[in-house]
Structures are given as C-alpha cells and as structure tokens.
Amino acid sequence: MSAMTGLFAHGPTPLANTLDFPGDPGILGPDSVSWRVLGDASVFVGGIRALVIQSAHAEVVAGVEDQSTYRSDPLGRLSRTSVYVTETTYGAMPEVEAAVQVVRRAHRPVHGTSERNLPYSAGRPEMAAWVHNVLTDSFLAAYQAFGPARLSAVDADRFVAEQTRIVRLLGADPLPETSDELTAWIANHPDRVVTN
C-alpha cells in the first residue's frame, strides 16, 4: 500500500470526489473484470511491459521523447497515467469524463515528426490505439502470469471489451474486442518497428 501512496504523492489524488456521486458505478462497475485485474499488484509489471512494447512504434517514441516530462519528472508522469487508469476504471462517470478530458488536453499539443520523417500526433486515433491496446494487452498478460488466478477466456475477452469501452471516449481506433484479436493486432501492426 505504501507504494501506491508514494506513487500518488507525485500528482493529483484519484477518486477524490467519488463519494459525491452515490450509486454511480462509473463506466464499468464493481462486477467488471477490470476492477479485479487493475486492483492487483501485477499491473505494475504490466505497466513496465507496456512501456517496452510501446517503444516499438517510432512515432509514439518520438512524441514521448519530444513532448513528455518523463525524463525530468518520471514519477509525476507515472502518477498522471496511474490517476487516469484509476479514475477511468473505478471512478463515477463525472470522474471518468474528467479524466478523459485531462488526457485530451494533454495530448492536443503533442505533434511533430519522427526520426523516420513521419508525422505524429497524440490525437491521431491510430496512435492512441497503439498505446491503449498495448497497455490493455500488457495488463492482461501480467495478470495471467502473476495474478492470483488466471482469467478464463471469457473473462479475458470481457477485460479487453471493458477497456475498449473506456478508450473509445478518447477516440482511439481501431480497438480489438477480444483477447485473441488484441494479440494479433499488436503482433501484426504495420507501424511497429522490428529490428533483428
């Protein structure tokens, strides 16, 4: 628990207003698979895995290198991502919508040209999909490997569909609906940089 407290000490406190919305389960609710998966400590492993895989997309890397505060304020950057995941998963709908707007505002000015001389924009649905889909796949893979019990195929698909419901609010596209579709989408992504 102290790791979580320390993480959120570097940014806003998530779910600060949830009790102001009694009876509002948010976009997913307590019976969702996401509440179970994202409440497990394996998400930390999933987050690290996601960063490694996300770096296989040159334009995503360029956006992070050129625009992010991850070098000067790594804990703050991590905290802001954690707040977004926490609020969109567990928050009441007004908190979910506010978290999405924070990300939209933060991503609006993120654009430029990568080392491959290709344009990038954090607002592009395809780039948002890469980041989100890899994060979802990584959370799922980490939970399956290190969580208290593996999810059934049905629950793994539910998790992917639930996370897709959240990120649709950001305008990301395309968004696979099942675990198998998600794995295939990442493996076959045309913008993925593959080196031998």
Tell where the protein language model's regions lie, with residue ranges.
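Mature, function-bearing regions of proteins
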Residues: 1-130, 136-196
